[in-house]
């Protein structure tokens, strides 16, 4: 199959049919709900916390709460529902996670979304968890991942997943491709294309997005939602303290498989970065929406799916997604 990534692709414009990009609709239906843009901040401890989840839900954006405060997830679901907001949580596949699903079922606390969040999601452990969630909480929209092949997408969909998350190691804070030799780093966009062709349900593109134009490219090649970490790191609302260095402001960003997340140096496939402070997350989200509106206007449409119909050219290839390692 052709191998390419975000920086290797340029989309080819079609005739514009709108007078202003403000006419363009970027909304996406994903599961039971519709959101302003097809973007979700990564479910990482340096990106999302409960306060930001509340803000995103109130303002029409999708979110997925991370799974690293294991004992707080039941209360989180209750708190979100008490506020009249949707609940979206992450789970792993260890035995305690089965107990969590059972507890949610017993208390009739049914989150609208559950994401099974595993580095290598093409596994029996994930398939078993999908089946358990669907048995205990049949109304939940289950996102399963992460995977990188059409075969994995088919298996997880057949097990009952409502969406699959595609991306093995292309993230800015991820070094899986260097530590293991495996992954979709350098061909993430081609992996999305291959997985989307095999899928009958939505695909979440996870990792490797470095610029707002990459969102449009993800949609073009079959994604319904884009999970983004590094572009959302460093805002007022993201967790962590502002650090000053040489007169400039930064915030910490680390991968979910880094030693900083794990608390020990064992099976480490993530790293820690200092990213520039970016101010308010609302400004970043608004810019993403405006850039996506412009992209759709270049595609010759008024709605998101117009991007699926455009032609493209392959210009070059690089394994590092533009990162300086």
Swiss-Prot record:
Catalytic residues identified in the record: 174
Instruction: Cite a single GO BP annotation.
Output: purine nucleotide metabolic process
Q: Which GO terms describe its molecular function?
A: GMP reductase activity
Query: According to the UniProt record, what class of enzyme is this?
Result: oxidoreductase
Q: Pfam families under this entry?
A: IMPDH
Q: Which reaction does it catalyse?
A: IMP + NH4(+) + NADP(+) = GMP + NADPH + 2 H(+)
Protein's UniProt keywords contain Oxidoreductase: yes
Q: What does this protein do?
A: Catalyzes the irreversible NADPH-dependent deamination of GMP to IMP. It functions in the conversion of nucleobase, nucleoside and nucleotide derivatives of G to A nucleotides, and in maintaining the intracellular balance of A and G nucleotides.
Protein name in UniProt: GMP reductase
């Amino acid at each position: 199959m052709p191998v390419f990534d975000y920086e290797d692709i340029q989309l080819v414009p079609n005739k514009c049919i709108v007078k202003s990009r403000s006419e363009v609709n970027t909304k996406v239906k994903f599961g039971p709900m519709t959101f302003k843009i097809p973007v979700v901040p990564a479910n990482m401890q340096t990106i999302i916390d409960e306060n930001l989840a509340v803000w995103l839900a109130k303002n029409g954006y999708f979110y997925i709460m991370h799974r690293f405060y294991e004992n707080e997830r039941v209360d989180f679901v209750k708190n979100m529902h008490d506020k009249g907001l949707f609940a979206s949580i992450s789970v792993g596949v260890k035995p305690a996670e089965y107990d969590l699903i059972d507890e949610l079922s017993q208390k009739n606390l049914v989150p609208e979304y559950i994401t099974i969040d595993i580095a290598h999601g093409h596994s029996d452990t994930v398939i078993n968890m999908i089946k358990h969630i669907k048995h205990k909480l049949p109304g939940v929209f289950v996102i399963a991942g992460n995977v990188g092949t059409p075969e994995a997408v088919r298996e997880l969909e057949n097990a009952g997943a409502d969406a699959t998350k595609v991306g093995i190691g292309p993230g800015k804070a991820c070094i899986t491709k260097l530590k293991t030799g495996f992954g979709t780093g350098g061909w993430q966009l081609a992996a999305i294309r291959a997985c989307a062709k095999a899928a009958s349900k939505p695909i979440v593109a996870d990792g490797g997005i470095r610029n707002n134009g990459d969102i449009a490219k993800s949609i073009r090649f079959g994604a319904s939602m884009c999970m983004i970490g590094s572009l959302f790191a460093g805002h007022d609302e993201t967790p962590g303290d502002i650090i000053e260095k040489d007169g400039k402001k930064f915030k910490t960003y680390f991968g979910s498989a880094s030693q900083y997340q794990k608390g020990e140096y064992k099976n480490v496939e993530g790293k820690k970065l200092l990213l520039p402070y970016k101010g308010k997350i609302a400004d970043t989200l608004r810019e993403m929406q405006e850039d996506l509106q412009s992209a759709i206007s270049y595609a010759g449409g008024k709605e998101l799916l117009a991007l699926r119909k455009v032609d493209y050219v392959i210009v070059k290839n690089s394994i590092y997604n533009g990162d300086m390692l």
